[in-house]
Amino acid sequence: MILNIYVDGSGGPNSGYGFFVKETGESFYKKEQNITNNQAEYMAIIMVLKKFLDSNDEINIYSDSKNTVSQLNHEYAINSDQLRTLAREAWDLIGKYTNLKIKWIPRSENLAGKMLGS
């Protein structure tokens, strides 16, 4: 089975992050104070990587954060120590997957953003 998982995160006074699984309708959102948009996007991806680690399904993670996706795919440099720490955690988890893709999508196509109300 292919799982298409949409992630989203937001910074600011109502910061938090979450995901939505298109095939099952499962969604999750967690409030997290004092984080940036980029940190929230990383946290959403890490949460998905941890949750589905034991799955044998093909996993496609979609994010509307071009910066985060490009950094995780080694296309952009990471200049923030906080983001570098989150990226290392994500890369450690990514290495445990055999069939995983992390892709950028436009905000208008992000089902997590629509479902989570961000």
Predicted regions and their residues:
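RNase H catalytic domain
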Residues: 12, 49-117
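Short, conserved alpha-helix that lines the donor NDP-sugar binding/gating region
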Residues: 41, 45-46
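RNase H-like nuclease fold core
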Residues: 1-39, 50-51
